[in-house]
Amino acid sequence: LEIGGVVRLVRRVIGGTFLFEMSGAFILTLRFLKDMDVLHAIYYGIFHSISAFCNAGFDLMGRYSPFSSITRFYNDPVVILTISALILIGGIGFFVWNDLREHGLHCRHYALQTKMVLSATAVCLFGGTLLFYLFEHNRLFAGMSFGEQLLNSFFCTVTPRTAGFNAVDNGALSESSKFLSI
């Protein structure tokens, strides 16, 4: 790589990171405005977006209830899907984003790494969501609607790759679900 190529690569990484994190922050801030004043909503939106994208899992919701993470949003698709998307996009990495940007939906042109990452991610998401649903729909998710059960099954599948987000009480998961998480 020449120095110009390295500079271009770094710019793309920083630009892509900023785009994804700020998009997530904007969406989360708009949602948090329903429950918080403007400054807290902006701060929480930015903080949680960066935390999710970097797969850190840190959250500030303990202010509302100790050890709560984002459990108060267990039935909110905007929060759950935005944080899930940020975790997944941050987790698949820059080279996969770049391949997707360069080749669009033309899968034949993807690098082997991109094909493997996307395939493994899809299998894990589908399989994990199905298994969490089967393990928890009559237990932890029993009081939820079918849509909420699927949403939380999906979120339970996405979040083990982070250090701490949860929308349901992980301590109340069945042994099978806990095993699936590891």
PLM ranges: what are they?
Residues 1-182:
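Membrane-proximal intracellular helices of multi-pass ion channels
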